[in-house]
Amino acid sequence: MLGVGFVFFFFSRFFGGLQTTLRPFSFSFGLAPLECPPPAAKPAFAIEDVKSPFTLRSNVSSTKKKEKNKPSYTFPVPQPKLESQWREMEWTEEQKASLMKTISSYRPSCHEGTQARVLLLGPVGSGKSSFISSVQSVFNGRVTNRAMVGTSSTSFTKKLQSFNIHGQKGEDPTGLVLCDIVGLGGGEMTGLTLHDILSVIKGHAPEGHKFSPDQPVRSETVGYIKKPGLKDKIHCVAFVVDASKILTYPKDLSTTFRLLRKHISDLDIHQVALLTQIDQMCPETAKDVTQVYKSRIIQDMMNKAGDLLGMSTSYIVPVKNYSSELDLNVNNDVLLLRAVDHILQYTDLHFQDNAPQHTGPKIDLGI
């Protein structure tokens, strides 16, 4: 009995001391404390008020950087081709030469504006800079990267850059200027504001202006153009969207596009759209770009791009930019040149709409 009592005394003292020692870390299973709900996530392409201008920027998680080596989209299930092209195209050297001549000789119908200024607008990585370089490559006769192109998830272009497309060797520059700016959804510190976009279109933003949401274009901005002429303004806007990302773009991007289109339309500026990366969507088109208008997949992507932009597909043209190629391809050149010709048609409408009205000399009717 003495031994049993001793053991009982020992264990009671030991566990009693242990309980006292661990009391601050003990858990009770009563009612769980009330917790504040997590803050609602901001939309990926939010339009936020920043000291009066609206910021169009992305709040997408940085985890995308870890996945940058993954393909953005895999080929859909192959579908039977259409029997005929749903847009008429001629894939010949003669057609390429004809389009190049048309573009090279183009001059705005209004004498005040000597060049047609086209602004490219689209999400980061949509192919704006690549399109500029691809078009210039066609006229250079070899693949060149005139507009610097990046591959990161943030916008490589940080400032307003205007590229006058040069004609073929020995020819004068064309009457076309393609303007490149930071992509939509460029991040917290490089976001593009609606205020700045409209300032560029109205002709107030100086060439080389570096965009920052906390330093919007104002009259105090260095180089600010107080009274822009027609030559300083944008005459057409071309939205650029990546076909391989249409199904993964944030839903709020459509709202952003529609807001932009409303404000741009209020300025009487015509708008078109370029659908890039078509070769990543359709294996047949990747092999042979002449199949683009026979592809049901591309036709479906065109419709989806129209829904995203709130735009009829008649304004949208598919293109394949030069990226890894070292040599030009005549069929790809024709597709690119048709896109430029499409842009110029709507650009010229702007000049026609804004041409000065000449009423002619007054006639004395002797009344």
Descriptions of predicted regions:
Residues 5-13:
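Hydrophobic alpha-helical signal peptides and transmembrane signal-/tail-anchor segments
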Residues 300-305:
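Two-metal-ion acidic nuclease core segments, chiefly of the RNase H-like superfamily
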Residues 106, 110-112, 123, 135-269, ...:
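Switch- and interface-adjacent substructures of P-loop NTPase systems
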Residues 127:
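Conserved glycine(s) of the Walker
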Residues 2-4, 18, 27-123, 156-171, ...:
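Short, flexible boundary segments at extreme N-termini or domain junctions of P-loop NTPases and their
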Residues 119, 270-273:
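A structural signal for isolated positions on well-ordered beta-strands in alpha/beta enzyme cores
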